[in-house]
Amino acid sequence: QAEGVVGITGISNVALWRVVEAREEALRQGVAPYGLVQQNYTYAYPTPEPGRHNWASYELLDYAASTGVEGRPPLAVTAYSPILQGAYVRRDKPLWDGFDHPTTRERIRLLHEVAGELGATPNQVALAWLLGGEHAVIPVVGPSTVEQLDDLLGAADLELDPELRARLDAA
């Protein structure tokens, strides 16, 4: 990094303990630690599975939020598949393994309900939920069309008031 070759390094799909251990070892060696961790994260969540290390757990989000203060190098969290590969807006899309359960279906139903109330799309509501939460998470999106990109960018202007967020969180 000192030579300007690499601005920030990151890690993906690993357990929190590995992130912490790698960052501590980097500091011991006098090099910049990982500044970013990328995990799967979205409004719906998978059923818990032993060994599932690709999900941005609350513990990971909390750890990242504790960095960047008191001399600790910051750690940003990015989320891949934040719109569940289109499943929030396309009922023909099968849910990923681990996501096909009643809570996901209820959360998708609620996304549609809230989107209707706000004049937004379910994807916009899901991304606004991710962007405006207690822990900062940066969504990584991969739209296939300009229309999809425009839709997703609309989430940046959508703010969920505390009552709506509580309603979404409670599902």
Predicted feature locations:
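Beta/alpha (TIM)-barrel catalytic core signal, keyed to glycine-rich beta->alpha loops juxtaposed to Asp/Glu
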Residues: 1-169
